Design a protein with these regions (language model features):
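Short, hydrophobic/aromatic beta-strand segments
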Residues: 125-132
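Asparagine-centered strand-capping/turn motif at beta-strand->loop junctions
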Residues: 118-123
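Surface-exposed acidic/polar loop and edge beta-strand patches at domain peripheries
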Residues: 1-108, 112-114, 126, 137-177, ...
Length: 225
């Protein structure tokens, strides 16, 4: 059973990336997690501090080919662990030089994927850093009545910048014609270990998915629907 959203663009290769404006949307095929960044995320804008450079939607990262890709499968005690590693670099001559080293791992028999990222600035100059883990749950997990479970100290509606309660954002609605984006900004509460847990639960299917991450690295959750 698929847990993620897949868009109508299909899989799009890096060579077809459109960096300007909302061109990113022409290659956003969905998937369980899409990484956005690394020097910019968000709506397109002009960076007046960098010679009016045009910054396209969500940055370049998701279209940068990975290198040094490797797999490893081995026993670690009683666990059979599968790992996939690779590197991605966002760089320009006389400018940005950021390298992402990623490892995705799982243990045979577990229903869990772990993503470990390390970002290194290989330039002699400081660099901006913006990063989004764009999670894309889809049908049938995401359906009418699917619940978002989140412990938030504050939740606001993005466009109107007004505080909202769970009754407004917690339950998924049915598809609507000519619907606009609904975006909510959550400031989650971490547990004693400093980790945040967020879940999406379909009670009818008895199916769910959850995310766990350190709040010191990801202090804000954006809910887009």
């Amino acid at each position: 059973m698929s847990l993620c959203f897949r868009s109508n663009t299909g899989d799009v290769g890096p060579a077809f990336y459109e960096s300007q404006g909302y061109g990113w949307m022409r290659g956003f095929f969905g998937g369980l997690v899409t990484s956005c960044g690394m020097i910019f995320t968000g709506h397109p804008e002009i960076d007046q501090e960098e010679e009016n450079e045009e910054l396209g939607l969500h940055g370049r990262l998701s279209f940068i080919p990975a290198k040094n890709v490797a797999t490893e499968c081995s026993w670690e005690g009683e666990d059979y662990v599968v790992r996939v590693r690779g590197k991605m670099r966002e760089a320009v001559v006389f400018g940005t030089n950021l390298e992402l080293t990623r490892e995705i791992s799982t243990v045979l028999g577990e229903k869990c994927l772990r993503i470990h990222d390390q970002i290194e600035n290989l330039s002699v100059d400081p660099s901006p850093l913006m990063f989004v883990y764009h999670s894309n749950p889809g049908f049938p997990l995401l359906n009418l009545g699917t619940r978002l479970v989140i412990n938030s100290q504050q939740s606001t509606e993005w466009l109107e910048d007004r505080e909202v309660g769970p009754e407004e954002y917690q339950l998924a609605q049915s598809p609507q014609e000519q619907a606009h984006d609904d975006v909510y900004i959550h400031r989650p509460i971490a547990d004693k270990e400093g980790n945040v847990q967020v879940a999406l639960v379909n009670d009818e299917l008895k199916l769910g998915i959850y995310w766990e991450f350190p709040i010191r690295e990801m202090p804000i959750i954006t809910q887009w629907q």
